[in-house]
Amino acid sequence: MEQFEAISIEQAHSRWQEGGVVVDIRDPQSFAAAHVPGATHLTNETLPDFVRGADFEAPVMVICYHGISSRNAAQYLISQGFDSVYSIDGGFEAWQHRYPQDTQA
């Protein structure tokens, strides 16, 4: 994969249920308030450790607030050698609205 793929909330939820990796790029306060269970909070500070410990062949889904910033982050992960990276359209706002039961603080 040379470029990330944008996926819907429903596709992301299905992949998450199958064990897909979710990385959340929102600010620390937003992440602490609520996030996808099991998501990794990815920041400039946590990025090096995430990359060092990553399985580059495992699909990675990037979530932000509304699905815009995640596109740049997804493309960056592709440039770092990740094989399958997805940007979640609608972001966490859409996830929380559609799947409130699959949101944790």
UniProtKB/Swiss-Prot annotation:
GO terms for molecular function: thiosulfate-cyanide sulfurtransferase activity. GO terms for cellular component: cytoplasm. Its EC number is 2.8.1.1. This is Thiosulfate sulfurtransferase GlpE. It comes from Pectobacterium atrosepticum (strain SCRI 1043 / ATCC BAA-672) (Erwinia carotovora subsp. atroseptica). The keyword Hydrolase does not apply. The active site is at residue 64. Transferase that catalyzes the transfer of sulfur from thiosulfate to thiophilic acceptors such as cyanide or dithiols. May function in a CysM-independent thiosulfate assimilation pathway by catalyzing the conversion of thiosulfate to sulfite, which can then be used for L-cysteine biosynthesis. Keywords: Cytoplasm, Transferase. The gene is glpE. SMART domains: RHOD. Belongs to the GlpE family.
